[in-house]
Amino acid sequence: MSETAPAETTAPAPVEKSPAKKKTKKAGAAKRKATGPPVSELITKAVSASKERGGVSLPALKKALAAGGYDVEKNNSRIKLGLKSLVSKGTLVQTKGTGASGSFKLNKKVASGEAKPKAKKTGAAKAKKPTGATPKKPKKTAGAKKTVKKTPKKAKKPAAAGVKKVTKSPKKAKAAAKPKKATKSPARPKAVKSKASKPKVTKPKAAKPKAAKVKKAVSKKK
């Protein structure tokens, strides 16, 4: 009789699904924490918003946080720790009670110190505006280049005018070369000759007295 060995059955390896779920839960919790502002900021806002001179008590502070949508019951321990840390830093002053139980008020020195850096930022913003306006200066230099280009045109005009004057100068030379008038001067002796010929005309005038004498003789005959 042949004996048959029993077949070895291999069990499947267990799939670890639980660690992946834990990671997703942790990531979701981290996202929830990151969405809201820290407790210290919420406490400082609530204390600064209150108008009570004696400070804000713990129950009044919890009411203000609950009105802002903060879960006070789950984060009760965080509120107390936040109050203690703010008092130790000096941002809050505890007017009544000890520890987390009591009334709290904003420190005026810290509030004024926070306001000063804001004023510095505004001054820096004003200083940045002139830096933005400085690139406009190169545009003015481009305008200056245009004026430099125009100046050669002005230099050309006087040169052209000088050429015109030179061209006109030959006319003056022609006017100076009018010695033709000197040639007319020999005509003047002719006028002298005409004056010399006038005594010839005076000879007939001497005959006039003779005619008068003839008239007198005729009158005597009558």
UniProtKB/Swiss-Prot annotation:
MF annotations from Gene Ontology: chromatin DNA binding; DNA binding; double-stranded DNA binding; histone deacetylase binding; nucleosomal DNA binding; structural constituent of chromatin
Entry's Gene Ontology cellular component terms: chromatin; euchromatin; heterochromatin; nucleosome; nucleus
PTM-bearing positions, type Phosphoserine: S2, S18, S169, S185
Organism placement in taxonomy: Eukaryota, Metazoa, Chordata, Craniata, Vertebrata
Basic residues bias spans: 20-34, 118-129, 136-157, 165-183, 190-222
Ranges of Low complexity composition bias in the record: 1-16
Residue ranges constituting the H15 domain according to the UniProt record: 35-108
The protein's name: Histone H1.5
Residues annotated with N-acetylserine modification: S2
Residues with N6-acetyllysine modification: K17, K45, K74, K164
Organism: Rattus norvegicus (Rat)
Modification note: H1 histones are progressively phosphorylated during the cell cycle, becoming maximally phosphorylated during late G2 phase and M phase, and being dephosphorylated sharply thereafter. Citrullination at Arg-53 (H1R54ci) by PADI4 takes place within the DNA-binding site of H1 and results in its displacement from chromatin and global chromatin decondensation, thereby promoting pluripotency and stem cell maintenance.
Homology family: Belongs to the histone H1/H5 family.
Pfam families reported in the protein's UniProt record: Linker_histone (PF00538)
Residue positions where N6-succinyllysine is found in the record: K33
Domain comment as written in the entry: The C-terminal domain is required for high-affinity binding to chromatin.
Modified residues (N6-methyllysine): K26
Compartments it resides in: Nucleus; Chromosome
Keyword rRNA-binding in annotation: no
Modified residues (Citrulline): R53
GO biological process terms held by the UniProt record: chromatin organization; chromosome condensation; establishment of protein localization to chromatin; muscle organ development; negative regulation of DNA recombination; negative regulation of transcription by RNA polymerase II; nucleosome assembly; protein stabilization
Subunit structure: Interacts with MSX1.
Chain spans, region Disordered: 1-55, 94-222
Residues bearing the modification Phosphothreonine: T35, T134, T151
Residue numbers of N6-(beta-hydroxybutyryl)lysine PTMs: K33, K51, K63, K84, K89, K105
Keyword vocabulary terms for this entry: Acetylation, Chromosome, Citrullination, DNA-binding, Hydroxylation, Methylation, Nucleus, Phosphoprotein
Domain of life: Eukaryota
InterPro entries assigned: H1/H5, Histone_H1/H5_H15, WH-like_DNA-bd_sf, WH_DNA-bd_sf
